[in-house]
C-alpha cells in the first residue's frame, strides 16, 4: 500500500489532480522498485508560505518551486514493528508552478506532476548538488515522466 496525504492551502488544485499525482507517484514508486508499504505528504502552498518555509528550514529567504523533507535521513531504523516506510513531505508552490508552466509552454497539471515527482525523487535520496548527480536525477525524472506518459506536450 502507498498512502499520500494531500493538503491544499491554496484551494487551486482540483480534486482530480490529487488522484493524478497519486497515480504518478505510485508509478514512480514501482519504477524505483520500492515494494514495502510507504507513505508521504504533498502540500500545496502559495509564494508567501513557501518563502517562509524556505527561510525557516533552509536559511534561504526566497521563493522556490518545491521543497522536500526526507524523514529517513539519519534516522534510526525501528525493527519489530510493522509500520509503513515514511518517506517525508513534499511542499509545492502553486504560484511558481503556474509561472513555470507558462514559461515552458505546458499545462499547470504537467508542472504539478513534474514538481511532485522531483520532490519524490529527493525523498528517495536523489539530488542535484553537482553536475553528475543532476544528470542522474534529471535523467531518471525524464524516464519516469515519459514512461508514465506525462510529457511536455
Swiss-Prot record:
Pfam families: YbeY. It comes from Staphylococcus saprophyticus subsp. saprophyticus (strain ATCC 15305 / DSM 20229 / NCIMB 8711 / NCTC 7292 / S-41). Zn(2+) binds at residues 118, 122, 128. PANTHER family: ENDORIBONUCLEASE YBEY, CHLOROPLASTIC. Its cofactor is Zn(2+). It is found in: Cytoplasm. NCBIfam families: rRNA maturation RNase YbeY. Single strand-specific metallo-endoribonuclease involved in late-stage 70S ribosome quality control and in maturation of the 3' terminus of the 16S rRNA. Belongs to the endoribonuclease YbeY family. One of its GO terms (cellular component) is cytoplasm. One of its GO terms (biological process) is rRNA processing. One of its GO terms (molecular function) is metalloendopeptidase activity. Its main location: cytoplasm. Keywords: Cytoplasm, Endonuclease, Hydrolase, Metal-binding, Nuclease, Ribosome biogenesis, rRNA processing, Zinc. Binds 1 zinc ion. The keyword Nucleus does not apply. Gene3D superfamilies: Metalloproteases ('zincins'), catalytic domain. The keyword Transcription does not apply. This is Endoribonuclease YbeY. InterPro entries: MetalPrtase_cat_dom_sf_prd, YbeY, YbeY_CS. It comes from the Bacteria. Its EC number is 3.1.-.-. Disulfide bonds: none annotated.
Amino acid at each position: 500500500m502507498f498512502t499520500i496525504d494531500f493538503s491544499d492551502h491554496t484551494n487551486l488544485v482540483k480534486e482530480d489532480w490529487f488522484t493524478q499525482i497519486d497515480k504518478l507517484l505510485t508509478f514512480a514508486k514501482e519504477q524505483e522498485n520500492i515494494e514495502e508499504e510507504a507513505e508521504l505528504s504533498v502540500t500545496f502552498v502559495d509564494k508567501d508560505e513557501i518563502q517562509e518555509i524556505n527561510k525557516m528550514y533552509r536559511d534561504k529567504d526566497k521563493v522556490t518551486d518545491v521543497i522536500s523533507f526526507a524523514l529517513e535521513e539519519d534516522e534510526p531504523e525501528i525493527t519489530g514493528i510493522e509500520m509503513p516506510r515514511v518517506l517525508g513531505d513534499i511542499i509545492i508552490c502553486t504560484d511558481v508552478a503556474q509561472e513555470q508552466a507558462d514559461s515552458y509552454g505546458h499545462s499547470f497539471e504537467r508542472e504539478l506532476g513534474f514538481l511532485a515527482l522531483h520532490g519524490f525523487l529527493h525523498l528517495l535520496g536523489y539530488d542535484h548538488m553537482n553536475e553528475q548527480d543532476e544528470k542522474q536525477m534529471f535523467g531518471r525524472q525524464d524516464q519516469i515522466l515519459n514512461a508514465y506518459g506525462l510529457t511536455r506536450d
